[in-house]
């Protein structure tokens, strides 16, 4: 009878753990629900929302806004749409030729994806393994949402949220895009919609709180723009990123990166970082104040995250001895 009792307890514990694992990896539960469930079951699952994860010192973090030079083997730039990502990628490619590291650039994770695994992630991890065999440093670049298990120092760049949203709307309708993407947009009937309609329906290029998702992750709750998603994004920014910048101060950000990651980043050009224009062939119209208000209201998490990142950049620049004129 005694053994039967322990058998039942053990089986219950195993089933609870399996349920939690299914919950996490299927993204059907939020981290808050997971925490509550863990307490109910009598044990605790640590989530990245609530605790710091111990990592190698070579990766650094932003908890102290330190300017201490880091020498990681791998840097990952999980770039955000319409935030000078083409400009930065081109610059890093030039840096790689001068500094002798491997530069690899991959594609875009779909907004609809909610799985931890992804083909882009698999390819990046394969590149990391290859670079180690070659005893070379690596910079990987991709439009990929944050993953905890990429063994690298993260960097990223944000943009003023309203300007980024408007730019993304027009970019998705630019003839400069891949033909198959434009064809899909037209087949769905989303190509000629107004920015107001695109915002309301969250069509491609108009999803809400886009930047927050890149720092939060692929999980379903990261798409919501909720307080929980914002908290996770801020946590990851603090604990996994060597530096974050904002597009409006791109030259100062590159100066910080040069001091922070000297093996990967050269000083900015003397005449400054020249923004690469990728949205061509479209006429950008002004927006009304009511439309601007709609964009702001829909992207509250992005606005708060942008201000948070701006504050971190200014503090890190100060520690680097770099003056930012506002």
Question: Which residues does each predicted region cover?
Answer:
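N-terminal initiation segments
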Residues: 2, 74-79, 83-85, 105-109, ...
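Juxtamembrane luminal stem/stalk of type II transmembrane Golgi/ER carbohydrate-processing enzymes
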Residues: 1-76, 89, 93-102, 110-120, ...
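PAPS-dependent sulfotransferase catalytic core
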Residues: 214-223, 232, 266-326
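Catalytic nucleophile-elbow at a beta strand-turn-alpha helix junction centered on a G-D-S/GDSL motif
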Residues: 79-92, 161-163
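A detector of helix-start/N-cap boundary segments at the beginnings of structured domains
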Residues: 62-64, 74-79, 241-244, 292-293
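PAPS-dependent sulfotransferase catalytic domain
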Residues: 44-64, 109-157, 163-269
């Amino acid at each position: 009878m005694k053994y039967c009792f322990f058998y039942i307890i053990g089986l219950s514990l195993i089933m609870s753990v399996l349920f939690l694992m299914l919950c996490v990896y299927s993204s059907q539960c939020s981290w808050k629900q997971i925490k509550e469930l863990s307490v109910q079951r009598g044990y605790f699952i640590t989530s990245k929302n609530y605790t710091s994860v111990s990592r190698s010192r070579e990766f650094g973090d932003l908890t102290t806004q330190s300017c201490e030079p880091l020498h990681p083997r791998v840097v990952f730039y999980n770039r955000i749409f319409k935030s000078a990502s083409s400009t930065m990628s081109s610059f890093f490619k030039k840096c790689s030729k001068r500094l002798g590291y491997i530069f690899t650039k991959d594609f875009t994770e779909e907004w609809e994806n909610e799985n931890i695994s992804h083909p882009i992630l698999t390819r990046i991890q394969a590149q990391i393994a290859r670079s180690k065999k070659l005893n070379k440093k690596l910079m990987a670049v991709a439009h990929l949402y944050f993953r905890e298990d990429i063994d690298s120092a993260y960097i990223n760049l944000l943009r003023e949220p309203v300007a980024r949203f408007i730019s993304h709307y027009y970019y998705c309708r630019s003839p400069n895009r891949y033909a198959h993407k434009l064809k899909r947009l037209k087949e769905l009937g989303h190509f000629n919609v107004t920015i107001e309609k695109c915002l309301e329906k969250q069509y491609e290029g108009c999803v809400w709180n886009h930047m927050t998702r890149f720092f939060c992750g692929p999980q379903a709750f990261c798409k919501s723009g909720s307080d929980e998603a914002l908290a996770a994004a801020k946590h990851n920014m603090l604990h996994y990123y060597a530096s974050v910048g904002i597009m409006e101060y791109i030259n100062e950000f590159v100066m910080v990166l040069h001091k922070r990651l000297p093996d990967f980043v050269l000083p900015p050009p003397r005449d400054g970082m020249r923004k690469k224009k990728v949205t061509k062939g479209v006429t950008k119209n002004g927006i009304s104040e009511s439309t601007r208000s709609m964009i702001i209201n829909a992207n509250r998490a992005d606005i708060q995250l942008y201000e948070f990142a701006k504050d971190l950049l200014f503090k890190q620049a100060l520690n680097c001895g770099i003056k930012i004129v506002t």
